[in-house]
Amino acid sequence: MGIQAAEISAILKDQIKNFGQEAEVAEIGRVLSVGDGIARVYGLDNVQAGEMVEFPGGIMGMALNLESDNVGVVIFGSDRDIKEGDTVKRTNSIVDVPAGPELLGRVVDGLGNPLDGKGPIEAKERKVADVKAPGIIPRKSVHEPMATGLKSVDAMIPVGRGQRELIIGDRQTGKTAIALDTILNQKSYNDAAGDDDSKKLYCVYVAVGQKRSTVAQLVKKLEESGAMEYSIVVAATASDPAPMQFLAPYAATAMAEYFRDSGKHALIIYDDLSKQAVAYRQMSLLLRRPPGREAYPGDVFYLHSRLLERSAKLNEDFGAGSLTALPIIETQGGDVSAFIPTNVISITDGQIFLETELFYQGIRPAVNTGLSVSRVGSSAQTDAMSSVAGPVKLSLAQYREMAAFAQFGSDLDAATQQLLARGARLTELMKQPQYSPLTNSEIVCIIFAGTNGYLDKVDVKEVGRYEAELLTFLRSKKADFLQWITDEDPKFKKGEPVEKMKAVLDEFAADFA
């Protein structure tokens, strides 16, 4: 049977029309089973660990378990639209997220997709979410202060740029409040820095397993205070799948590392890592990995250590940037010896321990000064702060110990009564309302007044009023003196400015009644 001329021309036209169109080649697999946010996929023989794969409908997943006959994939989204037999495509890229200044002021999910309805993010760079931490050579010891604006923290448990300081405590003890105040406190420093990026501190807040309403309130507070302009919020809320809650801290760290590696300074707050560990446990058990203590998988320590080791202070050869971490851990009934709390305590450079009992006594922030410690922060304190804050921690620790014994006996000697009286006033002095951070110079003046006997004749109930009026006096009449404390910081080592500070406090004491 011959081919007619009309057919030949039709075939030629068809060939010419399709000329140069290359077929798209993609390595695909098939879904064997799906459920609980986990898909078993057959056929992706060359897939990499941690690689992104794509399901029908644009749903993404990450290959975690590479087994001999199938691949265990965790799904970043709803698994309801995925069914057995669906095709799964490789993307040939490890999970990465957008990074850069374009993210500032935005609220994103664990993959960097916007959640705030302000349009797409036009980031010029992308960074792999889970990268290796800097080695030993690029690092430098922590030596610059990272002010939180909280008297009890900056004086007794100082945090330096590049440090990892754990905030640990039961639920509803004010852990997030400390972290939020720290972000708000950076506004005055960032405004004072102007265009000098090397002095600014960019903040990244990661909400893991929080209620959406809580995250919305936090974002609203940051926007009202003008703090969103230097902040990024990464949210993997309670309603998000476990893989999203597991990934969010890594993705946020990659965003913060952009600033660290550009010679700038960043702060990252993980709120909180207990919920990330729970999400990771859920994923691991569903992937049939063997459980260990408290049913957590064997590598749950590595989960947190590889995350927190990425926070570091880099030396001048590598840009002198820093990434400071404030991980938050929620304890159950004050049990700091549980598995996850002990893991994170051993990884970090100190902890701020918050106590329910102190919180209910009205001592807020409810910092237990005896159990809290900063292992490297003292070398980052300003000379002014370290010279006046030295006696405070000792005085408070002695007061707490003595107060317990004083309940039993009434005939106390004069020295003990003096210690108890001053301790009660220092405890009162450490109280601070939320959203009211103080500058370094203001804290120095307040602590100096407390440790040098200026409060000894003030009634305990009047300490709050004394502090409020002292701050008003300093801000309105002695603004140049506050600036002088900052400018003449090195002189505090030699004890030179003591007389000048006493003169200012004597002047205020004459007016205070």
From Swiss-Prot:
Specify one Pfam family: ATP-synt_ab_C
What is an example of a GO molecular function annotated in this UniProt entry?
Answer: proton-transporting ATP synthase activity, rotational mechanism
Its keywords, alphabetically, are: ATP synthesis, ATP-binding, Cell inner membrane, Cell membrane, CF(1), Hydrogen ion transport, Ion transport, Membrane, Nucleotide-binding, Translocase, Transport
Q: Which reaction does it catalyse?
A: ATP + H2O + 4 H(+)(in) = ADP + phosphate + 5 H(+)(out)
Q: Which domain of life is it from?
A: Bacteria
EC number(s) per entry:
7.1.2.2
Main subcellular location of this protein, as a coarse class: membrane
Q: Which InterPro entries match?
A: ATP_synth_asu-like_sf, ATP_synth_asu_C, ATP_synth_asu_C_sf, ATP_synth_F1_a_nt-bd_dom, ATP_synth_F1_asu, ATPase_a/bsu_AS, ATPase_F1/V1/A1_a/bsu_N, ATPase_F1/V1/A1_a/bsu_N_sf
Q: What class of enzyme is it?
A: translocase
Bilayer topology: Peripheral membrane protein
The answer to whether the entry has keyword Transport is: yes
For the ligand (ATP), the binding residues are 169-176
Annotated localization: Cell inner membrane
Which residue positions hold the site described Required for activity? 372
Would you name any one GO CC term? Answer: plasma membrane
Q: Which family does it belong to?
A: Belongs to the ATPase alpha/beta chains family.
Q: What does this protein do?
A: Produces ATP from ADP in the presence of a proton gradient across the membrane. The alpha chain is a regulatory subunit.
Q: Which PANTHER family match?
A: ATP SYNTHASE SUBUNIT ALPHA, MITOCHONDRIAL (PTHR48082:SF2)
Partners and quaternary state? F-type ATPases have 2 components, CF(1) - the catalytic core - and CF(0) - the membrane proton channel. CF(1) has five subunits: alpha(3), beta(3), gamma(1), delta(1), epsilon(1). CF(0) has three main subunits: a(1), b(2) and c(9-12). The alpha and beta chains form an alternating ring which encloses part of the gamma chain. CF(1) is attached to CF(0) by a central stalk formed by the gamma and epsilon chains, while a peripheral stalk is formed by the delta and b chains.
Name of the protein in question: ATP synthase subunit alpha
- Organism this protein belongs to: Ruegeria sp. (strain TM1040)
